[in-house]
Amino acid sequence: GLPICGETCFKTKCYTKGCSCSYPVCKRN
């Protein structure tokens, strides 16, 4: 399935694979 990217960025990192930081939350790449 597709990654769920709802977590808050840690600095500029997202821990979920396939997600990138769109501050303050992570978005799917």
Curated annotation (Swiss-Prot):
One Pfam family named in its UniProt record: Cyclotide
SUPFAM superfamilies for this protein: Cyclotides
Keyword terms of this UniProt record: Antibiotic, Antimicrobial, Disulfide bond, Knottin, Plant defense
UniProt cross-references to InterPro entries, sorted A to Z: Cyclotide, Cyclotide_sf
Superkingdom, taxonomy of origin: Eukaryota
PTM field: Contains 3 disulfide bonds.
Site of covalent link Cyclopeptide (Gly-Asn): G1-N29
Tissues in which the protein is found: Expressed in root nodules but not in seed.
One of the GO biological process terms: defense response to bacterium
Disulphide-bonded residues: C5-C19, C9-C21, C14-C26
Family statement: Belongs to the cyclotide family. Moebius subfamily.
Function, in words: Probably participates in a plant defense mechanism. Active against Gram-negative bacterium E.coli ATCC 700926 (MIC=0.5 uM) under low-salt conditions. Not active against Gram-positive bacterium S.aureus ATCC 12600 up to a concentration of 100 uM under low-salt conditions.
Annotated domain remarks: The presence of a 'disulfide through disulfide knot' structurally defines this protein as a knottin.
Name the UniProt record assigns to this protein: Cliotide T15
UniProt source species: Clitoria ternatea
